[in-house]
Amino acid sequence: MRHWLAAFLALCLGFAAHADGERAGDFDYYVMSLGWSSNWCVLEGDARGDDQCDARHNFTFTLHGLWPQHEAGWPSYCRTAERDPSRGESEAMADIMGGAGLAWYQWKKHGRCAGLSAKAYYAAMRRAYGTVIIPPIFAKVSKDLKVPASVIQDAFLQSNPGLQPDMITVTCDRGMIQEARICLTTDLKFRKCAGDVVRDCTLKNAILGAVR
């Protein structure tokens, strides 16, 4: 009863509700989160010497995660009988995620809720990442820029036929472009984002750090 009341109040107040330990596979759609790598490095990665931030990579938007989502709220840390991924399976995701540690954490928090094995979830993340064309112009960002956050969304819309404005939201963190979040059906097709997912950044001069 208390769980139901908390969820009801969250909906009434317009807040997103999440629940830990839900049953795996019980969700409505995915949110795929793509992070601008160099900004993440400035905010977090550089301080810990993360390999993702080494200039040899030339990362633009990397895959942050593929998150099971309810029409209102989201599950996390679900109960599952599936085994955790091996170190090798996680390391194999570094080419699109920047590192094995993030891949494993995404499995632990979100992947267990997908109702898939770890191997199948990693494969789904790779397929999801492959459904989106990262606008080629981003690879040419050779110096820090200040841009309207809406430019990021527009670039994705132009590069991805079928992607509509209500299917993507761009977020900022501490004045920097943070992520492009794209909503996908359970079979990884573009779909409209529910209201609690939308976090549109309205900055007119958000920092887009140089590729590295």
Label the model's feature ranges.
Residues 1-3:
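Positively charged n-region of N-terminal signal peptides that target proteins for export
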Residues 33, 45-212:
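Domain-level detector of nuclease and nuclease-like folds
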Residues 17-21:
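Boundary at the C-terminal end of the N-terminal hydrophobic targeting segment
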Residues 22-51:
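N-terminal regions that are enriched for targeting/export leaders
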Residues 6-14:
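Bacterial N-terminal signal peptides
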